[in-house]
């Protein structure tokens, strides 16, 4: 009986803990244009907020951060939603505790609000990658029309875009690359016609690669190949 009572009490306490756990307040547009339903919304660090445009809304809305992140794009942003639509506010999971302004890009700064991130959670590490141009023969790159680049995930990263160039001339690019934290993969950048032309009759070149990842810092690398 004592064991059963202890189990019952434990389950009750567990349920209370779950009920009191922090949950991000949805950022919600007002039905009447053009405001949000509250001046501020709260979430724990590490959570991904949600934007909601109510079913009786009269127009499209979104929620986009005022400030830019390390990728030179908004710190966070929802999709632009019709009446009854909703979408995750991507980027909020990386925010440190603090207060962040946002607005609807359709209706301007008159439709704005604040997102308050508290310290009851832990922010997700921002996407981060390292790049390196693999050792390869220039003749093979030129003839095969392919440049091999190694991508290493310092943290889990998705939607990576990589471009390769020689001086001011672009060789080619690849996008939608994903890599897990601590993992590496070889990515093939296919040369464009202009890229192949840039390597024609060259005996040695310095190849530069640049990578961008949503919500993370850009990465770069270079190597001389001959």
Regions inferred by a protein language model and the residue ranges of each:
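Extracellular glycosylation-rich, acidic/polar low-complexity regions of adhesion-
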Residues: 125-174, 203-226
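Exposed aromatic-hydrophobic patches
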Residues: 87-93, 184-193
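Beta-strand-rich extracellular modules
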Residues: 54, 105-109, 192, 210-216
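Short glycine/proline/serine/threonine-rich loop/turn segments at secondary-structure transition edges
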Residues: 96-100, 195-207
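Bacterial N-terminal signal peptides
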Residues: 6-16
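Extracytoplasmic copper-binding redox domains, predominantly the cupredoxin/blue-copper superfamily
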Residues: 21-131
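Short proline/glycine- and polar residue-rich coil/turn motifs
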Residues: 80-86, 177-185
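Acidic, Ser/Thr
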Residues: 52-56, 152-154, 192
